[in-house]
């Protein structure tokens, strides 16, 4: 064991990725659906590894540059994720959700600061308690930034000791922070004597939102593709264009003649024995049996690739129209609408869902039909899995430049710093990209790498560097005080947010369940709320608050450290 510990001490890269791998593995374990998750596990595993190393006389310490770089990548990734929703929160339809998402973090910050001062907790406790009680692991980074930026008077304590206290406070408060908000979002309607399930059903009927129990994948397909052998004398000798004119409800997608595939050319003259592949709505395919001839199981003729595209809604003729008005259009049986996004936020697809300018439609269907849909709705963009590294690089540079800006205030110079600058630049880039769709493409998988690897790696380094000093600061009295403050900071804000949303803003209780979860920037409670009411309605109240509170809680780790001392 001694040799292995020394090996890790002399090979920091192996140490780092061993910690990350173990954290992801440990984070997968759960008891009745509750677990640490990879990020919380990273700080636990990091501290444990460092403690084991110290027991064998090896003090692990990883490079500060690597730690900062990982955190900066994470912050930019957060900006990319929340940007469209954050900007969308500024419109009048979302303002109530945004207000709730501002109230909750401010209350949590105030309770943490006052609790730290009341109990006289040591440096670092405030930042860790905020991160743990609000289940916002990113706040650990901004709390660390307060130490590295030199805005705190450290006294006799070392940066490593403060980092250890941040990690300790985070670990003590995280469990209730996670479980508590789930229980509150799930049971607050019952405490208030409200039937949230009935409220969800009422909202579904009024807005055409599909129920969560509706099958997401069924054997029924409204669009069908079939092959017919041309034997009907009325069709022999007619061109494909003439056939389309007579039967506009069908899409000719292929013509097979002997060993040749002629495609769907309008000038092609149909001959006896040709095999024609037709696409259309299922009811239409069975309405005119024999129009060409008998149906045949010709796999070669039916081997038609489907197309996928993202369509940016720009045409005035379609904006303001609910989806139900397109049910009778020629495209209704030829393309399938997978999802709709507005400012980067997915919308439930219902009959009353109204299209707005700059909405993005994700469609699948036959290539000609997809192209036609692009002409009808606006501008088409093909799906791409490539990341625009040029925009990513300049977005990072913009963030660092914003971080350099400082303004005089209260006798000192104040600025966003690198982390805040990158968060802001990510918001700017993703907001523009979500509207134009033709630059700055960062697929979800690529953005997840920035966020997941960045945050887990950063937190792992914090744990490794702080672990050796952790046990020296842990006492029962301090741990109890930290838990009490964390419990209050986690429990009180959601209750107040619910009361304001229900009594003052008159928000539908099912929506408010999701809004309360969003105000704490935690998707778990929204998921449980959806299960509780048997509807997807709570998710509608979630995205705006999730974006706004996520940004605020991320930077509030810094303010918790500064204001508490």
Swiss-Prot record:
Highest taxon of source: Bacteria
Residue ranges of every copy of the RCK C-terminal domain listed in the record: 210-295, 296-379
GO molecular-function terms, A-Z: monoatomic cation transmembrane transporter activity
Segments traversing the membrane: 4-26, 33-55, 68-90, 97-119, 162-184, 389-411, 415-432, 453-472, 482-504, 539-561
UniProt KW keywords: Cell membrane, Membrane, Repeat, Transmembrane, Transmembrane helix, Transport
GO term, biological process aspect, one: potassium ion transport
Membrane topology: Multi-pass membrane protein
PROSITE patterns noted in UniProt: RCK_C
Pfam families (UniProt xref): Asp-Al_Ex, TrkA_C
Location of this chain's protein in the cell: Cell membrane
GO cellular component terms given for this protein: plasma membrane
Similarity comment: Belongs to the AAE transporter (TC 2.A.81) family.
Full protein name: Uncharacterized transporter BPP1579
Phylogenetic classification of the source organism: Bacteria, Pseudomonadati, Pseudomonadota, Betaproteobacteria, Burkholderiales
